[in-house]
Amino acid sequence: MITRLLKVSLALFAISPLVNVGPVNVTALLLLLASVLQLSTQPQQFSLFWRQYWVFMLTMVALTSAFLLSNLLNKNPNTLDATFAQSRWLLLLAFAAPALVYSMKMKDWRDVVYFSASITLVFTIVYLADAFTYLKLESNLILDVIDAQRSDLLRPSWVFNPHPFSRTLIAAMLLLLGCTLVSNWGILRVIFCLGILGLGTLLVLGAVRTAFIAVAVLACLSVFLYRGKRLVSSLSAGLLLCVVGLWFRGQLFPMDQTDKSLGLREALFEQGVNAFLATPWFGGGYQAARAISWPSELQQFAGAQTMATTNTHVQWLEMLVSYGLLGGLLFTALWLLSGWLILKASIQGFGTRKLAGVLLFLNWTSLTIASFTTVYRESEWALWLVTLIGSLSLIELQKKSSGGTPTLRETASL
């Protein structure tokens, strides 16, 4: 019963970035509660798991301590709340990873994948219908039904900012691509391919330059990570998607608007660097970048593009501004450690496990590329968590199949 609850919680959390920020937070809480409940029945799972990955756990604890220290030094009136707001994803990972790795079997993961793929197809149809009614009929009919507002009037990116939504679309495309390659039914392959085509259309309409660059990088990277001809040929189509997307963006945004956008990013980057240099060791505390003022010549344009919320538009710089050199270095170490674990999963195993590992690493690469042009929101953190936990599960499955580290049951019997 608890395992089923855990599986359902993971499935809902995995698809929540497709919906909005609210569902991500709700499903994250549900997954945390389910994980704690699972670990309460077998508490040795927690220590057994993190003994193997003690360096990663130590880095998470150190990073959380850096968050707390920075907020204390800056006399944040809500120190604990601010620290929790930034470190909640690490807390979720600490409990969810051992609970899922030791409780979920290969069949359970397969069920989660196909459930997520099915829901992705449904949302793809909804989003395409919304884009059609908005662009062709000039109607917000679908958004009116759910009483939501469009964040960007030029690009039909659901109710999201187009940038985080583009990362979700890329992750969804990788998911459907994996289902296409492993499915034995021709009709399912056709359906999944149509879903990929629909998601690609939405990605083009979003006109996010970084997303197209990421797709091209993933297409090239797949050649080195996976020798399967179908995967290489499928992801090579990403090069065509990149070209079409960049062309559409050029049609949508005149050169003067592009120059303003780049000017805004350059100005914010410069002010972010200045803010970091003002408090280089421990930073300015949680969301310190919001104190950055817009350049006067870009004030109106900035408000229209970012809904009047300020950040540096670079995840790495954002961490330096908020938590100084200490927090920035620890965050970088944590991110690179997660990348190493995900890469490790991609080079082990064979067949379906090999394919899954490669797709997970490609998704981590997509998120990494995005970090140089945006600040992570709930959707990116959720995608990172699912990617990392999936990779850790693949590593543990490989250990079991090769007779490596003893399982929890074997350890208990010693």
Language-model region placement:
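N-terminal signal-anchor transmembrane segment
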Residues: M1-T41, L63-L73, L367-I369, L385
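Transmembrane alpha-helices of multi-pass inner-membrane enzymes
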Residues: L30-V36, L174, V358-L414
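Aromatic-anchored transmembrane helix interface
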Residues: M57-S65, N78-V101, D111-T120
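Alpha-helical transmembrane segments of multi-pass inner-membrane proteins
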Residues: R110-S151, S157-Y226, L341-K344, T365-T368
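A membrane-periplasm/extracellular boundary helix in multi-pass inner-membrane enzymes
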Residues: A129, G206, V223-L262, E270-A278, ...
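A conserved mid-to-late transmembrane alpha helix and its immediate loop/hinge
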Residues: S157, G200, A304-I342
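Hydrophobic transmembrane alpha-helices and their immediate junctions
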Residues: I191, K229, Y323-S366, G404-T405
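Long extracytoplasmic/lumenal interhelical loops at the membrane interface
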Residues: M255, D259-A267, G285-Y323, S346
